Every structure is written in structure tokens, then in C-alpha cells.
Amino acid sequence: MTNGPRVVYAVVKLGGGLLGRNGAFERVTGALAAFGAGRPLLVVPGGGPFAEVVRERSRHLQIDADTAHWMAILGMDQYAHVLACRIRRAALVERERDIPVALAAGRIPVLAPYHWLRAADPLPHSWDVTSDSIAAWLAGALGAARLILLKPVAGDPVKLADPYFPRALPPGVACQVVAPDDLEALDRALGDGGSHEG
């Protein structure tokens, strides 16, 4: 059971670990452009190197958990700008109401989540909560049927995601991890959700 009415069929979270991995980022963004067109999905960024800087420097800077949490989410916003630039037909969105507008215009919405999460503040402020748990919460909030985590390797999402993830993933949301070496799995995972316009 998800939290709200269905806004998208699938939430696709693109992990920052794909950056700099032998063309993985290029393959994944190309696949999203090809497979995502005309399908009711939302792309959610990982924190990538932007959030990793916060993690690495938070102790040195002597910032508290709340500050680090919001700075890391701002890192997700930065990665969202990269994805919106690199995924063909993507549109950067910041709030739930922007998503159906982008979809209606034939665009692939990429969420910069800071404003939405700052208003809702749904998750603990801890490094046990990463973009995986944020994507899981968003899947529930949007009534999505599927959550797809794009990561360097495939496997059990509970083992590959952050410690809070099992609590963040709503019942009834099917979760799958897809790796860049099997992007046909992404097409299959999105296949039930809407038309494919190529």
C-alpha cells in the first residue's frame, strides 16, 4: 500500500556510484532517455560525489547531523542538475505538482528534492538514511508501483541500500536493483507502466 494517489508508475533512482565507472553513467543516461520517453516515471538522483564531500568533511567542519542531512540533500539537487542536462528530453522539477506537467509535455522529470523534503521532513537526519531511502519514501508519496535503483552491481536491494531502507520502502512498492551491464532489465521493469514512444 502506498501513501498517495498514483502520480508515476515508477521511481528510478540513479546512484552517484555510476559516475566515472567506465562509461556506466553514459550508458544509463542514454537508456533512460530511450526507455523513459512516454512512460510515467520520475528520476531521482543519488548524492554522488556532491553528498560524499559533506560526509567526508562534516566532522572536520564540526557540523551537526541536521546540517549534514540538508547539505547532503542539496548535493542530490546538484546531481539532479547534471542528470537534467545529460538525459535527453529531461526536465528538472522541484515539487510534486511539477511532475505531471513535465510528463504531459513529453519530458522525463528529474527531481531536485531539497524543497519538497525540507517541507515534508519525512526521514531521520542520519547517515543511515541516504538517497536510497529518500527514493523509497518518494515512491510511496507518489503512489508508485515500482522503485528501480540503478547501481554499479545488481543484487538484493536490502543488502545494497542504506540501513534505513527496509523501513522507508512502503509495502506494495516492488523494488529492483538494475546494473549498467543489464539495462534491458530497466526496460522490462518500466514495461508495465506506460507506452514506449522510442
Predicted regions span which residues?
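Nucleotide/pyrophosphate-binding catalytic subdomain
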Residues: 1-193
